[in-house]
């Protein structure tokens, strides 16, 4: 037996004929009669008829009242690429889970890659999204300097992009109003100094995130203005920015060093760009036994920050919730709107709310009422 004949033993003749018919309809890209299909494929009319009826039954073709058959446009399943900030950052994990649930609920596939809080990794992941030809990219990475490189790779592939919290060229912005969430955090700090320390504040520290760029840095700008709105006569020298990089251990060391250098100052306000930074400051304050001398407000309202705020005498007096659970549904809705060609705003802000030990206690009381 020749090799050619042995290979034919594995073929299914009727399936080959069915594929010939489908490929003809795809190539012609217009309605066809049974007679025309029979004539061009040279397949028996009986077989053509049965194959066409099977395709109609399975939804691959439709038959019009005049007897013409045409292929049904079967839209492919959409696939979004998501570059998560880091699996080690609680807020990023919450956003990822919210996005996974929202995408699954509408039948959108997700290609999830971890940016590992690292610019080089984020740029490599952008190349992976292009290689995999995703329909849309949702980018959540921290390095402003990497943003134009990532954005250019995605734009060159003609893939639309949504950027979370940090603006990227060519991308639609999605996230918090950074200045506003900072301002409201500052108001909480100012109110604490007013009520607990008789309007005294020796220092107002901002645990900043400069690598994320000016927009994210406006969280600290807003916090300083929020404090000034309550205590207007504070000298400019008492406002100090410290680069905490949004990381817990780094923030702990920096605040610990600051407290060691200022042992006799008992009215220190700290605004942190993230709760992870805020919790590092809490660690430092607790290690130094300075809980009564320091008040801290964070951003994101992650689970550990909520738990910390319920502790008696905690220096963490508040956090601004960015409502991570709302990110997923809103991102998916925004992404689908972009792909449908709808006009969307260049900046899309999420809702936020201030959470304090008092609001937590009130919510718990209502839950048990």
Predicted feature residues:
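Flexible loop/hinge segments that line or gate small-molecule binding clefts
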Residues: 144-180, 196, 203, 302-311
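Short, hydrophobic alpha-helical segments
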Residues: 130, 189-194, 259, 331-343
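Hinge/cleft segment of the Venus flytrap/periplasmic-binding protein
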Residues: 78, 215, 227, 322-369
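N-terminal helix-turn-helix
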Residues: 2-73
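N-terminal helix-turn-helix/winged-helix DNA-binding helices
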Residues: 3-10, 72-87, 131
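Hydrophobic alpha-helical
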Residues: 129-130, 136-155, 223, 243-308
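Short helix-capping segments at alpha-helix termini
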Residues: 104-106, 157-159, 227-235, 262-264, ...
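Hinge/beta->alpha junction and helix N-cap segments in small-molecule ligand-binding domains
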Residues: 83-97, 112-121, 143, 175-185, ...
């Amino acid at each position: 037996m020749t090799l050619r004949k042995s290979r034919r033993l594995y073929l299914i003749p009727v399936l080959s004929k069915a594929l010939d018919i489908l490929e003809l309809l795809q190539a012609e890209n217009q309605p066809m009669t049974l007679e025309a299909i029979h004539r061009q494929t040279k397949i028996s009319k009986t077989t053509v008829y049965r194959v066409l009826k099977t395709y109609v039954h399975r939804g691959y073709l439709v038959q019009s009242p005049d007897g013409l058959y045409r292929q049904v446009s079967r839209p492919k399943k959409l696939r979004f690429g998501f570059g998560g900030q880091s699996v080690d950052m609680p807020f990023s994990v919450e956003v990822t889970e919210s996005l996974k649930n929202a995408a699954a609920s509408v039948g959108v596939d997700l290609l999830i890659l971890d940016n590992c809080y690292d610019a080089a990794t984020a740029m490599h992941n952008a190349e992976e999204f292009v290689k995999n030809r995703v329909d849309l990219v949702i980018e959540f990475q921290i390095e402003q300097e990497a943003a134009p490189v990532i954005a250019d790779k995605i734009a060159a592939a003609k893939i639309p992009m949504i950027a979370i919290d940090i603006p990227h060229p060519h991308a639609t912005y999605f996230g918090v109003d950074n200045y506003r969430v900072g301002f409201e955090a500052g108001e909480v700090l100012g109110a604490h100094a007013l009520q607990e320390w008789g309007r005294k504040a020796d220092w107002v520290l901002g645990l900043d995130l400069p690598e994320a760029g000016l927009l994210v840095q406006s969280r600290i700008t807003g916090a300083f203005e929020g404090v000034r709105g309550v205590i207007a006569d504070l000298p400019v020298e008492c406002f100090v920015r410290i680069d905490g990089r949004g990381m817990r251990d780094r923030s702990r060391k920096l605040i610990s060093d600051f407290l060691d250098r200022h042992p006799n100052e008992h009215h220190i306000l700290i605004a942190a760009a993230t709760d992870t930074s805020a919790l590092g400051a809490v660690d430092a304050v607790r290690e130094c036994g300075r809980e009564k001398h320091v008040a801290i407000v964070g951003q994101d309202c992650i689970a550990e920050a909520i738990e910390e705020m319920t502790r008696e005498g905690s220096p963490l007096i508040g956090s601004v919730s960015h409502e991570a659970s709302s990110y997923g549904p809103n991102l998916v809705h925004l992404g689908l709107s972009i792909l449908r060609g709808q006009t969307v705003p260049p900046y899309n802000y999420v809702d936020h709310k201030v959470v304090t030990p008092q609001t937590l206690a009130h919510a718990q009381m209502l839950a048990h009422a």
